[in-house]
């Protein structure tokens, strides 16, 4: 088995078929200005203690937040095993990086705050990784977020796309 196949096998094996985690209900601060949440967290964003400048909506449904100055960016993504989310990784990670650098709080969400938004957060954290061991960093971030939030990037296709871009292609 070659190195890339081994990495992919080990990463998918160590993050699949785990105990069923509960869907998260709380919003999680991921970096100084990047937050991960669900649809309810987005609806509550205008009254949040965090003064969000942006909400990144990854659900299929477009909405507004009445009486709010929050900018909503909508990228409609389906949570299934055929959606190619990897084509959005570069733009989303660049946007989140700018939000962090400019101290502009952003909430990234999907319906449950697990798969679509979790995948974009994992991609963002992997894109910031300057370590020489992306496989270990992937496992560290994945398990840390799962411990913190409960269910996190349970969609095997989304995990595979992140592994291919940020782990396999880095080696």
Curated annotation (Swiss-Prot):
The entry's keywords: Host cytoplasm, Host-virus interaction, Hydrolase, Inhibition of host innate immune response by virus, Inhibition of host interferon signaling pathway by virus, Inhibition of host STAT1 by virus, Interferon antiviral system evasion, Late protein, Protein phosphatase, Viral immunoevasion, Virion
Entry EC no(s): 3.1.3.-, 3.1.3.48
Gene this protein is translated from: OPG106
EC top class, as a word: hydrolase
Source organism: Vaccinia virus (strain Western Reserve)
Name assigned to this protein: Dual specificity protein phosphatase OPG106
Function: Serine/tyrosine phosphatase which down-regulates cellular antiviral response by dephosphorylating activated host STAT1 and blocking interferon (IFN)-stimulated innate immune responses. Dephosphorylates the OPG144 protein.
Disulphide-bonded residues: none
Main localization, broad class: virion
Chain residue ranges for the region called Dimerization: 1-27
Family matches, as Pfam families: DSPc
Lineage: Viruses, Varidnaviria, Bamfordvirae, Nucleocytoviricota, Pokkesviricetes
Subunit description: Homodimer.
Induction: Expressed in the late phase of the viral replicative cycle.
Catalysed reaction equations from the record: O-phospho-L-tyrosyl-[protein] + H2O = L-tyrosyl-[protein] + phosphate; O-phospho-L-seryl-[protein] + H2O = L-seryl-[protein] + phosphate
Domain of life of the source: Viruses
């Amino acid at each position: 088995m070659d190195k890339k196949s081994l990495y992919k096998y080990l990463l998918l094996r160590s993050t699949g078929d785990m105990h069923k985690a509960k869907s998260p209900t709380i919003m999680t601060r991921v970096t100084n200005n990047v937050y991960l949440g669900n649809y309810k967290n987005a609806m509550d964003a205008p009254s949040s203690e965090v003064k969000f400048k942006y909400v990144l909506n990854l659900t299929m449904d477009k909405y507004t937040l009445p009486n709010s100055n929050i900018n909503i960016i909508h990228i409609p993504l389906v949570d299934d095993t055929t959606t190619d989310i990897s084509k959005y990784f570069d733009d989303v990670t660049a946007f989140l990086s700018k939000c962090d650098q400019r101290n502009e709080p952003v909430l990234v969400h999907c319906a449950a705050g697990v798969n679509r938004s979790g995948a974009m957060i994992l991609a963002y954290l992997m894109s910031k990784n300057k370590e020489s061991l992306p496989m270990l960093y992937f496992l560290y971030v994945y398990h840390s977020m799962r411990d913190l939030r409960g269910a996190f990037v349970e969609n095997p296709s989304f995990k595979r796309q992140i592994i291919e871009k940020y782990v396999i292609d880095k080696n």
